[in-house]
Amino acid sequence: MRWLTVGLLAAIGLLQYPLWVGKGGWLKVWEYDRQLQQQKEVTRKLEIRNAGLDAEVRDLKQGYDAIEERARFELGMVKQDETFVQIPEKVPGK
């Protein structure tokens, strides 16, 4: 009877090994699930960035407001009849 119990436990162990550690085992499934969640997070961030870029491209194609804003802030341009005034920041200690 003792050998039968040991034999059955060994058989159960041999049957469980591929389930947990084998090629399609639970450990692999959990690892793939973790990788999938990470990739979904990366994809979500990229979709948000792409939506912002898409909105900016549409804005640049349709109107001059975005172009004017970029010219003013990034290139320091002013309109023809405007006067540019720059006020220097106060230096601490003076």
Curated annotation (Swiss-Prot):
Signal peptide start and end residues: none
Q: How does it sit in the membrane?
A: Single-pass type II membrane protein
- Lineage, top-rank taxon, reads Bacteria
Periplasmic compartment: which residues?
22-94
Keywords (A to Z) from UniProt: Cell cycle, Cell division, Cell inner membrane, Cell membrane, Coiled coil, Membrane, Transmembrane, Transmembrane helix
Indicate the quaternary assembly. Part of a complex composed of FtsB, FtsL and FtsQ.
- Principal subcellular localization: membrane
Q: What is this protein called?
A: Cell division protein FtsB
Topological domain, Cytoplasmic: which ranges? 1-3
Cellular component (GO) terms are: cell division site; cell septum; plasma membrane
Q: Which gene encodes it?
A: ftsB
- InterPro entries assigned to the protein according to its UniProt record, in alphabetical order: Cell_div_FtsB, FtsL/DivIC
- Any one Pfam family here would be DivIC
Transmembrane region positions? 4-21
> Subcellular localization, per the record?
Cell inner membrane
Coiled-coil residues are 31-73
State the family named in the UniProt similarity comment for this chain: Belongs to the FtsB family.
Question: Origin organism of this chain?
Answer: Dechloromonas aromatica (strain RCB)
Described function: Essential cell division protein. May link together the upstream cell division proteins, which are predominantly cytoplasmic, with the downstream cell division proteins, which are predominantly periplasmic.
A Gene Ontology biological process noted in the UniProt record is: FtsZ-dependent cytokinesis
